[in-house]
Regions:
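Conserved NAD+-utilizing ADP-ribose enzyme module
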Residues: 2-27, 52-55, 72-210
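Glycine-rich loop/turn
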Residues: 24-64, 70-75
Length: 210
């Protein structure tokens, strides 16, 4: 196992924690597309047709979860990996207007269904992955944008789009060569969530499964 992930397994990482690359103003999220969608987006520095804003689009702050999802850019329709820098204000707007895809234990089912129906944003917490796609004992957030949220993402939040596909191929080859790829990965750190947003998305406040 690569060094960083062996260490993380031994640490008390909160069960649900947002880890990301971010600055004071921006956070990087990842998406993978077919070249027909990715190439125009990189050229325009925003998502343009054939990107379909009427469909829910999922953004992922975890680079390695994106690699798990796209199979290191080898899955059909996901062969171009994009790093999308968006405003932290926009990202936190999405979290504040979100609903968990599945209710947590103890949630009032009627209240959850009402929020699910009204919210343009879905939150899922899935097992984080190491570079070899092995599940880690804590979760990574995926944020699904639809309706008003998808429009805001496409039109207002994006600060830049970078094609990472060549870098992804380099890391994939290093893995196949049996190398430790820790130093080749984007640096990610815990994202500071205001308490209200942490409650909305169901983030953990302690390193346990709660």
């Amino acid at each position: 196992m690569d060094a960083r992930f062996a260490i993380l397994r031994r640490m008390n990482v909160p069960y649900r924690q947002i880890r990301a690359s971010f600055t004071d103003e921006a956070i990087t999220v990842y998406q993978a597309y077919d070249p027909a969608v990715a190439a125009p987006a990189v050229t325009a520095q925003r998502f343009v047709p054939p990107f379909k804003r009427e469909r829910m689009t999922w953004i992922k702050p975890s680079f390695l979860w994106m690699m798990y999802r796209c199979g290191w850019a080898e899955k059909p329709g996901q062969t171009r990996v994009l790093a999308v820098d968006i405003t932290r204000e926009g990202f936190e707007w999405a979290l504040g207007h979100s609903c968990l895809s599945h209710p947590d234990a103890g949630t009032d089912p009627t209240a959850w269904r009402n929020r699910l129906r009204e919210s343009p944003v879905r939150i899922q917490w899935d097992p984080e992955r190491d570079p070899h796609h092995n599940a880690l004992p804590y979760r990574s957030i995926q944020v699904g944008l639809s309706g008003d949220a998808a429009a805001r993402y496409a039109d207002q939040w994006i600060l830049g789009i970078t094609d990472l596909t060549d870098r992804v191929h380099d890391v994939r080859q290093a893995l196949r060569d049996g190398k430790d790829v820790t130093g080749m990965l984007p640096a990610e750190r815990p994202y500071p969530l205001p308490a209200e947003l942490a409650r909305t998305v169901g983030a953990s406040v302690t390193p346990d499964a709660g």
